[in-house]
């Protein structure tokens, strides 16, 4: 299933990415030259891949047995990475809501929870992803308001014939943040619900044969 492949990539890339970033930041902080920074970055990636290889090789690692605190850290890590990579544009962070909903449904399905517990868990993960999205939107708004060129950049980007005022920026930030917050909640909710039902139907079909 493509969903399982995506989860394996998401969880499998954590260690290599952390190692890469640690080596890169270390080189930058000591004021190394470009060639040393590049060499350090590649070395960090290779080191991370080697570590990941031995983790997987042991065969004791299961993404569905990770602690909730670890899952939260991984989610926040990717949210920050995407926020930085896409230069503070939060729309790309919406993808993590669906991934989280899919993962949480798969994690719970084997426990066969009752309807009350299932509803509570679905709400928990949906609220969590929405809150993280809210924080991402706040960060995006903060950087937008602290950058004196934001208004001019928006005017040029969208070829506007009028000046962008602070009031407009505030309105767009509030409206956009609210839309992203609600969208993330429902994306997570829908992904969870659809995944859980599909897994149940698949299980029933398998058992009936």
Task: List each language-model region with its residue ranges.
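Alpha-helical transmembrane segments and their immediate interhelical/interface regions
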Residues: 46-57, 82-110
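Hydrophobic alpha-helical membrane-insertion segments
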Residues: 124-142
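Hydrophobic alpha-helical transmembrane segments
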Residues: 164-187
């Amino acid at each position: 299933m493509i969903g399982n492949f995506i989860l394996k990539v998401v969880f499998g890339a954590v260690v290599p990415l952390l190692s890469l970033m640690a080596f890169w930041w270390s080189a930058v902080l000591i004021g190394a030259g470009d060639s040393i920074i590049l060499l350090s970055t590649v070395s960090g990636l290779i080191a991370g891949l080697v570590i990941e290889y031995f983790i997987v090789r042991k065969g004791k690692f299961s993404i569905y047995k990770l602690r909730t605190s670890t899952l939260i850290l991984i989610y926040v890590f990717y949210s920050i990475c995407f926020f930085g990579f896409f230069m503070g544009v939060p729309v790309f962070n919406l993808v993590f809501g669906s991934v989280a909903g899919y993962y949480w449904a798969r994690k719970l399905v084997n426990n066969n929870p009752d309807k009350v517990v299932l509803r509570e868990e679905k709400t928990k993960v949906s609220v969590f992803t929405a809150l993280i999205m809210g924080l991402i939107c706040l960060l995006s708004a903060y950087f937008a308001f602290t950058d004196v060129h934001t208004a001019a950049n928006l005017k040029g980007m969208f070829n506007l014939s009028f000046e962008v005022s602070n009031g407009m920026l505030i309105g767009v930030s509030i409206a956009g943040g609210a839309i992203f917050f609600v969208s993330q909640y429902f994306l997570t909710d829908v992904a969870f619900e659809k995944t859980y039902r599909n897994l149940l139907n698949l299980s029933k079909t398998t058992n009936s044969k």
